[in-house]
């Protein structure tokens, strides 16, 4: 059964260096949740703390109501998919998928039934007798995902699983992963630095930088309503303009270089004050017209 994840005041240190400081996070049951950010932002470190592969210097981690800080990784009932696939080279596809089931000493008929189920679900049934060296990268990733799901984990953790695939195969596999996650309904935590990938597969995304969560939201919210300049420039493409916010008769106006002024009706009430600002304008919001019309003259 899938479980929600709750993290409160997490701290991770390597020696005297603090990587993650006082981080709190809630991931809903059955949600596809992505940790997104540049290299070194702490996203994989946080994932490994959830998995139990990294020590926890502070804070509390929960699967449902169960605190997991001191639970051995093997007993957390997680499925893990790594960026290098980590399938066993000395086992064929069927034995790789069945590995976790055999480790749990399940009855032989149940092992056979669940192995067959996930071979078919991942569309690798025809490769059941094939060795890993005879599989493509995409096929190996399907095997890794089938093996992770076959044990019926409470949580599925995925650490940049598509980074070693070519561009075309990445698009194909991200669609497969999202479809399978929807079908199975398992709580999934996905790590990537690729914002396009994150936007395509996620229910919600946490944008991270320097060990802190900058913003959590749906892909649409992050794109249209970024909470700060980092999120605005990291998600998609944007044009950043310097300006001033001026309040006149309780209305907000954005003043730009050249004396242009625009009425802005989306400013939060607690931000209605004169201040220096940066305006983020997405490319698709710009309209090129032959004749003059409403808006700002760009050229």
Where do the PLM segments sit?
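The feature captures the beta-strand-to-loop junction immediately N-terminal to the Walker
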Residues: 36-38
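Helix-to-loop junction immediately C-terminal to a conserved catalytic motif
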Residues: 51
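Conserved coupling/switch loops of ABC nucleotide-binding domains, chiefly the family-specific signature
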Residues: 57-60, 110, 210, 242
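Conserved ABC transporter NBD signature motif
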Residues: 59-67
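ABC ATPase nucleotide-binding domains
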Residues: 73-79, 83, 87-230
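Glycine/charge-rich catalytic "coupling/switch" loops of P-loop NTPases
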Residues: 224, 253, 257-299
């Amino acid at each position: 059964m899938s479980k929600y994840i709750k993290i409160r005041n997490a701290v991770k240190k390597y020696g005297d260096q603090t990587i993650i400081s006082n981080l709190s996070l809630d991931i809903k049951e059955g949600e596809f949740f992505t940790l997104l950010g540049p290299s070194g932002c702490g996203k994989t470190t946080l994932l490994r703390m959830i998995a139990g592969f990294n020590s926890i210097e502070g804070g509390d981690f929960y699967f449902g109501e169960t605190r997991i800080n001191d639970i051995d990784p093997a007993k957390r009932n997680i499925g893990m998919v790594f960026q290098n696939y980590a399938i066993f080279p000395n086992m064929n596809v069927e034995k790789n998928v069945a590995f976790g089931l055999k480790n749990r000493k399940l009855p032989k008929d149940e092992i056979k039934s669940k192995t067959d189920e996930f071979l078919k679900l991942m569309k690798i049934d025809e490769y059941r007798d094939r060795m890993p060296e005879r599989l493509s990268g995409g096929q190996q990733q399907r095997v890794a995902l089938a093996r992770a799901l076959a044990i019926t984990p409470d949580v599925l953790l995925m650490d940049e699983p598509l980074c070693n695939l070519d561009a075309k195969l990445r698009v194909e596999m991200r669609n497969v992963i999202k479809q399978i996650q929807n079908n199975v309904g398992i709580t999934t935590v996905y790590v990537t630095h690729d914002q396009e990938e994150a936007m395509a597969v996620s229910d919600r995304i946490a944008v991270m930088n320097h060990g802190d969560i900058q913003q959590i939201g749906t892909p649409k919210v992050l794109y249209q309503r970024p909470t700060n300049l980092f999120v605005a420039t990291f998600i998609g493409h944007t044009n950043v303009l310097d300006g001033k916010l001026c309040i006149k008769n309780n209305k907000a106006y954005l003043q730009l270089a050249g004396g242009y002024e625009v009425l802005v009706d989306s400013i939060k009430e607690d931000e209605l004050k004169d201040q220096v600002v940066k305006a983020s304008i997405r490319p698709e919001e710009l309209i090129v017209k032959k004749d003059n019309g409403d808006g700002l003259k760009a050229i």
